[in-house]
Every structure is written in C-alpha cells, then in structure tokens.
Amino acid sequence: MRYRVPHDLLSRTFDQVRTCGAGRRECQVLWTSRWDAVADLDQLRHSRHRSYDGGLEVEDTWITEFWNELAREKRGVRVQVHTHPEDAFHSASDDTWPIVHVPGFLSLVIPQFGLGPIGLAGAYLTEIRSDGRWHEVTIEKHLEVLR
C-alpha cells in the first residue's frame, strides 16, 4: 500500500521529535489513519517513552491506553516513525520491538535526531513481511508526501 502523508503531518513529526529528543535522544511518533480511509495518514501520536543510550522504551500503560483510543476512534497505526543519532537504519532492537507485528507494517527511521531538513532524504523505511522479518523498501513506493 502507498500511504499519503500530508506535508503538515511530516512537519509536525519533525517538530515533535526535535522537541522531545532535543538533538540528544531518540524519539518516536506513530502515524495513524481511519479504518475507512487507511491510505490517508492524518494524525500523529507521540508515544510516552523513555529514551536511553541507543534506543527507547514505550511505557506499557501508554500502549494499553493508546490501543483503547484507537478502537474507540476507529483508527489504526500505519507507520512507526523514530529517530537515530546519525545515519538511519533499523537496529536489532527496532526489529524486535515494533509497536505492531503484522505483515505490511512500516517503520520509518529519520537520521540525526530529525535535526536536518524536513523531508525524507536520508531516511530509512522498512516493512514487516509475511516471513516475520523486516525488509528495506523504497520510500517513494510506500509514502507519498503531499504538498
């Protein structure tokens, strides 16, 4: 599936990861959409998490609250977005602990704690396949940034 990402959503994502990470820590947001318009990403949720050297951990209680909100609002998580300090890649921890474990789920990694220009240049996108493993995919084939 190719998701449509409003430029405003991308801008708000960069604002959030820059504020949360302060150029020193990883940060995560989740892009969601309604079940009746799956391809149209329209909200971001900043997970409650603890950042540590080399990663982050999402609070268990927040995850439970978040799933309940999604159910009430008839929404789903489509893309997990997080930052890395330097180059973008998917770490072993990223592979092991995604927020969603289903084929087709996407994880987008933004380099340099999101301090670079707003956009997807230098970002890394990966997808869970039916074999349960992550595989790098082409950003342009999966995410269309709308102006």
What kind of feature is each model-predicted range?
Residues 1-77, 86-147:
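Conserved beta-strand-loop surface patch within small alpha/beta domains used
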Residues 83:
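Short, well-ordered beta-to-alpha junction loops that form the rim of enzyme active sites
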